[in-house]
Structure formats: structure tokens, C-alpha cells
Swiss-Prot record:
The protein, known as: Small ribosomal subunit protein uS19
Keywords annotated in UniProt: Ribonucleoprotein, Ribosomal protein, RNA-binding, rRNA-binding
Organism: Crocosphaera subtropica (strain ATCC 51142 / BH68)
GO cellular component: cytoplasm; small ribosomal subunit
Function according to Swiss-Prot or TrEMBL: Protein S19 forms a complex with S13 that binds strongly to the 16S ribosomal RNA.
Family: Belongs to the universal ribosomal protein uS19 family.
Length: 92
């Protein structure tokens, strides 16, 4: 079920204040955040946000196509290393 339109999108307050400050200055710095649940808004376009994936911060450049999505969608938390090659017993 999606979020109510009456409430508006969720954005962490600390992240929103950092973006507003950078927009006032016209500065382009990498913003570190742990808030994967924050929704991308049009004010974030053109900024690079480093989203935490559980181990490190993954830098993400925000473009127009990303608006409305969550930050966590662009920072995968799991790495797939492939299936084991030499498992002969499982094939029989």
C-alpha cells in the first residue's frame, strides 16, 4: 500500500536541511546519509548523495528520472558472487 497523498513524501529532516543549505549556496558537495527510506524530490536533482548500504556509502548522482523513488533503491545491500561451479553431486 502506498503512502497517503495527504501526508506527502518522507524525507529525513537532516537530509532536507543539508540539501536546502547547499541549494542556497549553489555548492555541489557529496552528502552522506543513512536514510535509505527518504524519497527523492526535485530539490535533490544534480546533487551527489552517498547512501549507506550496510557496509559503505555508495555515491549516487541524482537525475530527473529518479524523482519519486527511494534512495535505498539505488544502493544494493547484497552482492551476488555466482553459483558454485564445481558442484558435481548436485547435478546427479
Amino acid at each position: 500500500m502506498s503512502r497517503s497523498l495527504k501526508k506527502g513524501p518522507f524525507i529525513a529532516d537532516s537530509l532536507l536541511t543539508k540539501i536546502e543549505k547547499l541549494n542556497e549556496k549553489g555548492d555541489k558537495q557529496v552528502i552522506k546519509t543513512w536514510s535509505r527510506a527518504s524519497t527523492i524530490i526535485p530539490a535533490m536533482i544534480g546533487h551527489t548523495i552517498a547512501v549507506h548500504n550496510g557496509k559503505q556509502h555508495v555515491p549516487i548522482f541524482i537525475s530527473e528520472q529518479m524523482v519519486g523513488h527511494k534512495l535505498g533503491e539505488f544502493a544494493p545491500t547484497r552482492t551476488f558472487r555466482g553459483h558454485s561451479k564445481g558442484d558435481k553431486k548436485a547435478r546427479r
